[in-house]
From Swiss-Prot:
UniProt keyword annotations, A-Z: Cytoplasm, Elongation factor, Protein biosynthesis
PANTHER family: ELONGATION FACTOR P (PTHR30053), ELONGATION FACTOR P (EF-P) FAMILY PROTEIN (PTHR30053:SF12)
Name listed for the protein in its UniProt record: Elongation factor P
Family: Belongs to the elongation factor P family.
Primary localization: cytoplasm
Gene3D superfamilies attached to this UniProt entry: 2.30.30.30, Nucleic acid-binding proteins
Role: Involved in peptide bond synthesis. Stimulates efficient translation and peptide-bond synthesis on native or reconstituted 70S ribosomes in vitro. Probably functions indirectly by altering the affinity of the ribosome for aminoacyl-tRNA, thus increasing their reactivity as acceptors for peptidyl transferase.
Cellular component terms (Gene Ontology): cytoplasm
Gene Ontology biological process terms from the UniProt entry: peptide biosynthetic process
Pathway where this protein functions: Protein biosynthesis; polypeptide chain elongation
InterPro entries: Elong-fact-P_C, NA-bd_OB-fold, Rib_uL2_dom2, Transl_elong_fac_P/YeiP, Transl_elong_KOW-like, Transl_elong_P/YeiP_cen, Transl_elong_P/YeiP_CS, Transl_elongation_fac_P
Length: 184
C-alpha cells in the first residue's frame, strides 16, 4: 500500500479494478480542514484519464511493474506481436498499448512494462531511423523561411521533413513527437 501523499507522476497503482499511472499530482492544503491530494491518472489498459481527489490519509495499492526488452516481430490485425528477448516468449499487444505504434518496423527493439507476466505498455526508442518511401519534390521558391513537406516512411507514418529530403533517404524521427530530427 502507498499513501496518496507519496504519489508522483509515473507511480503505478491498482484502483477501481484497473491499473493506473499517475500523470499529474497536486497537494492542496486547506485552511481549517485537512490537506487534500488531487491526482490525474491514466488507465494503462484503455488509455482513459480520470482525476481523483483524496484525503491525505488515504492509501492505494501500488503495483510492481517490470521493464523488459522486447523485439517487434510482425503486425496481426489490430495487435502487434512482440518477443521477450530473455525468455523468447511472444505477446500480442493491442495497438492502443503501444506508444508510437506507427514508427515500429520489424526487428526493432523496445521497452515493455510488464505486470504479472503480461505487457501493459510498450515504448519505442526515443529516436528511430526510417527510410523515406515517398515525398513530393521540394520547390525552393515556395516558402519565405525554412519550409517543409510531408514524407511517407517505410512504416506508413507521415512526418513533416525539410525540402531537401528525397525518397530513399534514411532519416531520424523522434517517436515522442513524430518530428524529423535529422539525416541518419
Amino acid at each position: 500500500m502507498i499513501s496518496v501523499t507519496d504519489l508522483r507522476p509515473g507511480t503505478k497503482v491498482k484502483m477501481d479494478g484497473g491499473l493506473w499511472e499517475c500523470v499529474e499530482y497536486q497537494h492542496q492544503k486547506l485552511g481549517r480542514g485537512g490537506a487534500k491530494v488531487v491526482a490525474k491518472f491514466k488507465n494503462l489498459e484503455t488509455g482513459a484519464t480520470v482525476e481523483r481527489t483524496f484525503n491525505s490519509g488515504e492509501k492505494l495499492e501500488d503495483i510492481y511493474v517490470e521493464t523488459r526488452e522486447l523485439q517487434y516481430l510482425y503486425p496481426e490485425g489490430e495487435e502487434m506481436v512482440f518477443m521477450d528477448l530473455e525468455t523468447y516468449e511472444q505477446f500480442a499487444v493491442p495497438r492502443s498499448r503501444v506508444v508510437g505504434a506507427e514508427f515500429f518496423k520489424e526487428g526493432m527493439t523496445a521497452l515493455g512494462d510488464m505486470y504479472e507476466g503480461q505487457p501493459i505498455k510498450v515504448t519505442p526508442p526515443t529516436v528511430v531511423e526510417l527510410k523515406v518511401v515517398d515525398t513530393p519534390p521540394g520547390v525552393r521558391g515556395d516558402t519565405v523561411s525554412g519550409g517543409s513537406k510531408p514524407a511517407t516512411l517505410e512504416t506508413g507514418a507521415v512526418v513533416q521533413v525539410p525540402l531537401f529530403v528525397e525518397p530513399g533517404e534514411v532519416i531520424k524521427v523522434d517517436t515522442r513527437t513524430g518530428e524529423y530530427v535529422g539525416r541518419a
